[in-house]
Amino acid sequence: MRYITTPIYYVNDVPHLGHAYTTIIADTLARFYRLQGHETRFLTGTDEHGQKIEEAAKLRNSTPQEYADKISFEFKKLWDEFEITYDIYARTTDTRHIEFIKAMFLKMWQKGDIYKDEYEGHYCISCESFFTQSQLINDCSCPDCGKQTRILKEESYFFKLSKYQDKILQWYEEKDPILPKNKKNELINFVQNGLKDLSITRTSFDWGIKLPQEINDDKHIIYVWLDALFIYVSSLDFQNKGENAKFWPAHVHLVGKDILRFHAIYWPAFLMSVDLPLPKFIGAHGWWTKEGEKMSKSKGNVVKPKEVVDAYGSEAFRYFLLREVPFGNDGDFSENMLINRINAELSNEFGNLLNRIIGMSTKYSQGNISKEGVLKFYNAELNQAKEHLNLAVEFLENLQCNRYLEELFKALSVANLAISKYEPWSLIKENKHEQANALVALCANILAKTSLLLSPTLPKSSQKVALALNFEISSANYTKMILDNELLDFKANPCEALFPKVEKALLKQEIKEEPKKEESPKIKIDDFAKIEIKVAKVLDCQNIEGSEKLLKFQLELDDKEIRQVLSGIAKYYKASDLIGKQVCVISNLKKAKIFGHESDGMILSAKSGDKLVLIAPEQLVQNGSLVG
């Protein structure tokens, strides 16, 4: 049995390229497992609770439920256009899920894994997550999305995440569940640095699931991530031992790299707490840019999946996303690269091979293609293609989607090269009809086997090949043609071009929008006067062990005062390059403890896009000079 899930997508905005990528990978896997004969369930859906949804609904003069219904419908509509064959469309507002999450919360509470306390810290509304000071970028920005965090203080229930630290590390070691493999070390380092207990309720908004009645505390809403993760189980009707309950645990959770921590640390701990088995694999993919730039409305470079599909078709888009980038790496969307893939691979290698087979078989044997003679004349080519096909299966099972497609097109190349090498038209002229017909049969069998394995990614095109050669894409033929490596006879039928050549770019260019500037709240001059900014000289600067972001400065403000200040600029500056330079520092902030080190002040910097520069006097001035 195979159970595949995408994340349930947050409905604060319409579907984007990242959503499409995850879902197309999941759909390819689900189709592949069905083709292999596995009983399969594929879940996708929408995450509809939380502060972001509440605020987005208010902006649109809508209730949260009305807003969630609208965006959830947009996701379903897009997945239909992409040929997505999900079995379960899950929503966190479903009554069955709400009752299940309350039962799970109560079970954790009764086990002693939940306790009540007070939390104060940096909270990112966009990511619905708390962060420690040491995790922040530039002292106040979210490390995941880059948006400014808020200091939030509220009563909260906490989950004893720290209790499961060793068990999570043991799971990584014994089961090796993280794909791609290089992501595992990042998680191990994070967990080994120490897991803090997790705040799992909120009181600052209303849109969410209330605590179980047994706990008798109506103020609290269950944390959106605790709510959302358990939908993978609740949607199988697990609590009622429904028909789909047997599919747990999941074979693979597919996620973007930004939410790997939630799935690979929080989720296994939650499952351990309620005594449920853990998923077999968690696969984390990268992000997408457009032509080397981060996508944003202000740049006018947002790739809208529906527009790409309308212009080039869902199959070309599905193929491009999976073929273009290794799973786990960041990808770059380029319309020119999409066109190149269509013309060079889908049209030339794939579609043109079908045209050649139909043309030759019609001309040489009235469309009848017999496997007789293939092993006699072309056994080497057949074995070469078989190696590529077997590798393709292996790569897809390990989520290496680009390598899977690469190997399939190498198999097609074996057939195309065989035609060029042996020239069936020349064989016919030499009266070598048996060898010529065997060559056509070799190519037809390679194309049929390849199309069978391409069908999870290109379902419509593969079906056209099956109709043109008169065979069936089925689990029975997977066993016969791939596992048993049998050859088939075919009857060729006329077929339209699978992928016509694309002569010019078809996407409309977006008009660049002027970025909307958010007005900061006005302050009085008296308030500003309270801030003391001084010039200081960097006497020493060092990296902090265990942190990729923090630098530790020893600053001289005047002859008598030396201060230690921490700043999250290690990604932008080398520590040794800053020694001897002057910087500007807010000198009258309360002392803070960051990553176990005292920090007495804040070094000023300016950030523009991906660049950050320190604020410094234009000319050398006396240390301790006031700015302002």
From Swiss-Prot:
The keyword Zinc-finger does not apply. Residues 527-628 form the tRNA-binding domain. It catalyses: tRNA(Met) + L-methionine + ATP = L-methionyl-tRNA(Met) + AMP + diphosphate. Its cofactor is Zn(2+). Its EC number is 6.1.1.10. Binds 1 zinc ion per subunit. Zn(2+) binds at residues 124, 127, 142, 145. The keyword Zinc applies. GO terms for biological process: methionyl-tRNA aminoacylation. PROSITE patterns: TRBD (PS50886). One of its GO terms (molecular function) is ATP binding. Pfam families: tRNA-synt_1e, tRNA-synt_1g, tRNA_bind. Homodimer. Belongs to the class-I aminoacyl-tRNA synthetase family. MetG type 2A subfamily. This is Methionine--tRNA ligase. The gene is metG.
